[in-house]
């Protein structure tokens, strides 16, 4: 049994002369909720795209659930999924039709039961007969999450999971994701620049800047390490080039 859901070694991704991901290595423990935290251009989405096999690394290795994805990518597909509010769902299909399409891709045995269960737990049952193109941004975010959970994934990738949601709904979604990870023993890797979300949701954080991991740790550990009161203050310190050792010296 492998200890880590994700194992990354010496990962590099270049786009022409631009180094989007600069020689990073990290592991994500099974059953954890781990965040990639960084501003725009930090490399979060590029990293997740490589982990999912959507982008080929310039160099380095990636193992997902014990499998080297360069050699065995397709064997992991039934066990993983992805959600992002920035990925469009077919507007001409109803929510139910969209979920049916994705359920069939994963060969779900009891599609009707799975859709019913997800729609109830994510509060989208009243949206099932509506066309996706007629939904609000927040409603689309919840539907995208239902799509990502259709196969009960053991590894879930999330890109800004609560974008476009009002504060109450966003907080509810975070609680839902925590319960999902706990109940299913699933691993979640999320990319975010929402400091409060990372602080409340994550067990562990990798802080990114210009394609590099500049610090890592549990949110409470990082807050204590930097002598700050929350992750937003920690993030600002890192963004401004200050490190924990600098603050101890000052």
Place the predicted regions along the sequence by residue.
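ABC ATPase "signature
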Residues: 216-217
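Conserved ABC ATPase signature
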Residues: 131-135
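Conserved catalytic motifs of ABC-family nucleotide-binding domains
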Residues: 152
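Helical segment within the ABC ATPase nucleotide-binding domain
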Residues: 171-183
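Conserved ABC ATPase "signature" region
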Residues: 100, 104-127
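Catalytic Walker B motif of ABC-type/P-loop ATPase nucleotide-binding domains
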Residues: 156-160
